Amino acid sequence: MQHETHTHGINMSALGRDKQSLNLERETVAIEVPGLSLFYGEKQALYDVSMNIPKQRVTAFIGPSGCGKSTLLRTFNRMNDLVDGCRVEGAINLYGNNIYRKGEDVAELRRRVGMVFQKPNPFPKTIYENVVYGLRIQGINKKRILDEAVEWALKGAALWDEVKDRLHDSALGLSGGQQQRLVIARTIAVEPEVLLLDEPCSALDPISTLKVEELIYELKSKFTIVIVTHNMQQAARVSDYTAFMYMGKLVEFGDTDTLFTNPAKKQTEDYITGRYG
């Protein structure tokens, strides 16, 4: 399909990202998916999905409810292992190593591939203890190291200036948007390589959403980010690459501007112009 697509009012203005030189073929690959299928019991949820997630870019997964985008996201740190009857066929390579190989240290994998969920889930602890939680699990207890990690992670999550004078107050006293940025700080404190964001703004107001979107843009200089979103405006704003999924299959994957303005598949065009989904 060669003609330009009407984008149904989608604002394509990115958050200041440099879009000139995006080329999926030239990117360094962080996560390689060479043909992945997933089953819940007898029900197949993913069908032979193949894609390469580029390093230190933001990749968005879009598609209607139930299309498999969150299921695919959760395969990247094996969260689906926690679902009874879940079975994966194929491989996922994180920097060349199959994370589904026998003997894989799943706890270490989840440190390397951190995840933030839809609803902010701070622990009922102080702001400080939320941030250092993962470090303490690793046996790190030196105050100087923890203090430095708290400041680094909270600055990285654009929250330091708002909470630096109340680090020992309960995290539950923060606003929803602050709680979500705290959860991001807690996730990056253990210095993962990949950040998975499963609709991180769906429970937030517009101002908090904008702060998280700006944060995502800042974080990609250090982390590979994959975000699932129902909000196509958000995908257009924050991502470098977008994957459109439908009924468990990957329909189209490419740079975000091209996918939204000149999609290769009619199914993609129908979705982004609001004909279904």
Curated annotation (Swiss-Prot):
Topology versus the membrane: Peripheral membrane protein
Family of the protein in this entry: Belongs to the ABC transporter superfamily. Phosphate importer (TC 3.A.1.7) family.
Binding site for ATP: G63, P64, S65, G66, C67, G68, K69, S70
Keyword Translocase: yes
Lineage: Bacteria, Pseudomonadati, Pseudomonadota, Gammaproteobacteria, Pseudomonadales
Protein's name in the database: Phosphate import ATP-binding protein PstB
PROSITE patterns the UniProt entry points to: ABC_TRANSPORTER_1 (PS00211), ABC_TRANSPORTER_2 (PS50893), PSTB (PS51238)
Any GO molecular function: ATP hydrolysis activity
Signal peptide bounds: none
EC number: 7.3.2.1
Residue ranges annotated for the ABC transporter domain, each copy included: 31-272
InterPro entries found in the cross-reference section: AAA+_ATPase (IPR003593), ABC_transporter-like_ATP-bd (IPR003439), ABC_transporter-like_CS (IPR017871), P-loop_NTPase (IPR027417), PstB-like (IPR005670)
SUPFAM superfamilies, per the entry: P-loop containing nucleoside triphosphate hydrolases
Enzyme class: translocase
GO CC terms of this entry: plasma membrane
Chief location category: membrane
Catalytic activity: phosphate(out) + ATP + H2O = ADP + 2 phosphate(in) + H(+)
Subcellular location: Cell inner membrane
Biological role: Part of the ABC transporter complex PstSACB involved in phosphate import. Responsible for energy coupling to the transport system.
Sorted UniProt keywords: ATP-binding, Cell inner membrane, Cell membrane, Membrane, Nucleotide-binding, Phosphate transport, Translocase, Transport
Gene Ontology biological-process entries: phosphate ion transmembrane transport
Xref: PANTHER family: ABC TRANSPORTER I FAMILY MEMBER 17, IRON EXPORT ATP-BINDING PROTEIN FETA-RELATED
